């Protein structure tokens, strides 16, 4: 597994990124979780101790897809989502931490690209039209971000 845990007794920081990777035609890249077949999502991951959020997004995109992007390639939506960490995952975080704060970014690709998924984390990928992608994802925050994508693209 290519996940690295943040410093501080090996516990994760309750701050993460969600990165929507999409084409100009609003096709959205989704990854299928290895441990949960049928669980589709965009790129996600936890911030490491000394990283800026854009660095976290760049690192997670590279780790989960093999796509090389720089901080300037990303669009920071200045949008955060706060959600409860499922009880079965709380042992990964400091004691008494029950919520995560997720920061949303997007990455525009000129066209669909071949993706190299991290086998320990994901079992496959698909490019879907944004409406289908919104229906396919498990997470409400991922769904809501995908549903905002057409408006975000028009306003950028």
Residue ranges and their predicted role:
Residues 30-33:
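Short, acidic/hydrophobic/Gly-rich beta-strand patch recurrent on exposed beta strands
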Residues 135-156:
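Charged phosphate-binding loop/patch that engages nucleotide di/tri-phosphates or the phosphate backbone
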Residues 41-44:
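A short gly/proline-enriched turn/hairpin at secondary-structure junctions
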Residues 3-28, 46-49:
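Conserved N-terminal beta-strand and adjoining loop/helix that marks the start
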Residues 36-39:
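A conserved beta-turn-beta hairpin within the catalytic core of GNAT-like acetyltransferases
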Residues 2-11, 88-96:
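Short, P/G- and charge-enriched loop/turn segments at secondary-structure junctions
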Residues 47-141:
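Unchanged
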């Amino acid at each position: 597994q290519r996940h690295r845990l943040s410093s501080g007794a090996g516990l994760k920081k309750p701050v993460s990124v969600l990165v929507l990777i999409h084409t100009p035609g609003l096709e959205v890249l989704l990854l299928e979780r290895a441990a949960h077949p049928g669980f589709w999502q965009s790129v996600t991951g936890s911030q490491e101790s000394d990283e800026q959020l854009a660095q976290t997004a760049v690192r997670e995109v590279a780790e989960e897809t093999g796509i090389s992007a720089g901080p300037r390639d990303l669009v920071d939506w200045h949008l955060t989502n706060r959600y409860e960490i499922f009880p079965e995952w709380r042992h990964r975080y400091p004691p008494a931490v029950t919520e995560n704060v997720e920061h949303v970014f997007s990455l525009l690709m000129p066209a669909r690209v071949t993706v190299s998924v991290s086998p320990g984390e994901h079992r496959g990928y698909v490019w879907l039209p944004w409406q289908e992608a919104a229906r396919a994802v498990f997470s409400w925050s991922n769904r809501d971000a995908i549903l905002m994508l057409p408006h975000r693209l028009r306003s950028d």
